[in-house]
């Protein structure tokens, strides 16, 4: 079957020569099927289709590497209205992280979560994201975070044509805000092991679907909600199945203190002790986690941090 050749011309092209990006204004990009065959200023070959990109930017797709598509369309407004505001309160992240987010998530039913995912994925595609990473929830969200919901969300991304990394979360315990503004932690009955097994099975069954556009990843919830055994088992499975890992860490001063009290270690030291540090680990947030030597450890292990 003949592959269609498409020429995009007259736009501002953000190109790359292998070492750095550069601008072509105007520029031309030509692709055949799913392969780019020309980037430059003038194309002399024939094309089956032409797109006039006058007044537009032609660029590689954006990578959005930390998303919660099933709840952000709901939680964003609440965070803006009643979340932590101002430098002092936002630095603690107490109300937003430990009260608003869990409560709003728990109030959403599975069908609403799918509608939110459809809305979020459509907005991402419309604004230039072609690769997205969605981090799901466990019992914190309505519907108890059943894997069937994760499967439905992954199917939405696959049918939309996005490249998607899907990671349902698991953890040993959950947290919340007490009336005195202290943070409580409560262990799950089985320390989250059954949820972990379900997430691993999802990763095995769904990795590589939709012509390879859907990938899976291991997502232990937060550094302060996962015991050492769960993190060590995460590393073992990641190595066995060659899966990436993303973990929430450095979200609040409370989290940093919690790890210090329970483990007598800094956040990074705890992750190192559990064997989690490595080039396949992405730390989400990472605002409150550093101590002398911690950044050097992350650099040595080629750990990525994003927010």
Q: Where are the model-predicted features located?
A:
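Short, well-ordered secondary-structure micro-motifs within conserved domains or adaptor modules
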Residues: 48-53
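Divalent metal-coordination and catalytic microenvironments
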Residues: 11, 29, 34, 55, ...
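N-terminal hydrophobic targeting/anchoring segments and the immediately downstream early-domain regions
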Residues: 56-59, 67-82
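Histidine-centered catalytic micro-motifs
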Residues: 61-72, 244-253
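Short, intrinsically disordered, charge-balanced linker/junction segments flanking boundaries
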Residues: 302-307
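Alpha-helical scaffold segments that flank or form the walls of functional sites
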Residues: 79-136, 140-163, 195-209
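N-terminal metal-binding scaffold of metallo-dependent hydrolase/deaminase domains
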Residues: 1-45, 56-58, 63
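Metal-coordinating catalytic core of metallo-dependent amide/deamination hydrolases
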Residues: 141-295
């Amino acid at each position: 079957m003949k592959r269609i050749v498409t020429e995009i011309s007259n736009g501002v092209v953000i190109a790359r020569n292998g070492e750095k990006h550069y601008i072509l204004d105007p520029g031309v990009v030509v692709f055949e099927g799913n392969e780019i065959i020309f980037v430059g200023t003038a194309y002399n070959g024939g094309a089956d289709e032409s797109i006039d990109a006058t007044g537009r930017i032609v660029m590689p797709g954006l990578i959005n590497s930390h998303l919660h598509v099933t709840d952000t369309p709901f939680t964003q407004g609440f965070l803006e209205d009643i979340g932590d505001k101002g430098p002092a309160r936002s630095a603690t992240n107490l109300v937003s992280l430990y009260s608003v987010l869990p409560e709003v998530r728990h109030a959403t039913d599975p069908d609403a979560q799918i509608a939110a995912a459809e809305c979020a994925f459509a907005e991402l595609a419309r604004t230039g994201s072609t690769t997205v990473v969605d981090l799901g929830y466990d019992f914190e969200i309505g519907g108890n975070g059943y894997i069937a919901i994760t499967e439905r969300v992954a199917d939405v991304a696959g049918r939309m044509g996005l490249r998607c990394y899907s990671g349902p979360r698991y953890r040993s315990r959950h947290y919340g805000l007490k009336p005195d503004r202290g943070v409580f932690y409560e262990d799950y009955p089985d320390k989250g092991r059954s949820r972990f097994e379900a997430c691993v099975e999802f990763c095995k069954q769904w990795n590589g679907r939709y012509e390879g556009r859907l990938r899976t990843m291991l997502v232990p919830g937060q550094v302060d909600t996962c015991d050492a055994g769960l993190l060590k088992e995460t590393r073992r499975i990641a190595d066995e199945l060659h899966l990436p890992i993303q973990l929430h860490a450095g979200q609040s001063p409370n989290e940093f203190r919690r790890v210090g009290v329970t483990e007598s270690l800094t956040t990074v030291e705890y992750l190192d002790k559990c064997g989690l540090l490595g080039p396949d680990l992405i730390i989400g947030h990472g605002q409150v986690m550093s101590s002398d030597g911690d950044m050097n450890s992350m650099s040595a292990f080629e750990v990525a941090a994003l927010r």
